[in-house]
């Protein structure tokens, strides 16, 4: 069993059950883990540092074999400094780095929403399409799915950016997003943008 990017603390009961059934579990995450069980069948790579994301942890485990995907994932987790630091190990143009940033953001964006029907792609289907690509830049350049994600993201963000705060002061603002699919999709990336830009 491979578990990526979900809190061990929140999912501890399921983890304990899997280990009790003698499953082998590979667990990589950057969220609060609580007490990590000591078990021969558990390999846990956990780092709760705010500058670390699961993609960077997996990249370390894989010794940089898929660094381009790690950079993409770090951008998707809104860790731009981490992504740029990782990207120093790549030989790519500034334009390509920008493409990895966009793709990471779009992958993250496609994961928000309480129902798969709200999303542009079922995350499993998107994963399979990404996996079929030779790498993230191949996906950006050659997959029509990239354009679908890009268009959806831009349209949803334009709606979000048109919202006026219910309340604002010099240190905070409160926004109410409508109960619509676009708002559910954009909630995470819009929050990231607000945090990054303010």
Regions found by a protein language model. Give the residues of each.
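Short, functional N-terminal and low-complexity linear motifs
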Residues: 22-29, 126, 156-162
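Long, charge-rich alpha-helical interaction segments
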Residues: 103-148
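Gly/His-enriched, cation/cofactor- and phosphate-binding structural elements
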Residues: 129-198
């Amino acid at each position: 069993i491979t578990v990526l990017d979900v809190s061990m603390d929140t999912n501890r009961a399921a983890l304990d059950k899997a280990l009790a059934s003698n499953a082998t579990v590979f667990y990589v995450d950057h969220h609060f883990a609580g007490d990590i069980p000591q078990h021969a069948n558990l390999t846990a790579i956990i780092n709760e540092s705010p500058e670390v994301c699961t993609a960077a942890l997996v990249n370390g485990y894989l010794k940089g074999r898929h660094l381009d995907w790690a950079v993409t994932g770090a951008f998707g987790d809104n860790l731009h400094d981490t992504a740029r630091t990782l990207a120093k190990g790549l030989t790519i143009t500034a334009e390509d780095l920008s493409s990895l940033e966009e793709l990471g953001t779009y992958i993250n964006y496609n994961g928000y929403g309480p129902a798969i029907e709200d999303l542009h792609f079922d995350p499993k289907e998107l994963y399979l399409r990404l996996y079929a690509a030779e790498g993230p830049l191949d996906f950006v350049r050659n997959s029509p799915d990239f354009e679908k994600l890009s268009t959806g993201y831009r349209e949803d963000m334009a709606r979000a950016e048109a919202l006026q705060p219910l309340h604002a002061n010099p240190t905070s603002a409160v926004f109410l997003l409508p109960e619509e699919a676009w708002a559910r999709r954009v909630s995470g990336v819009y929050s990231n943008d607000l945090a990054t830009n303010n």
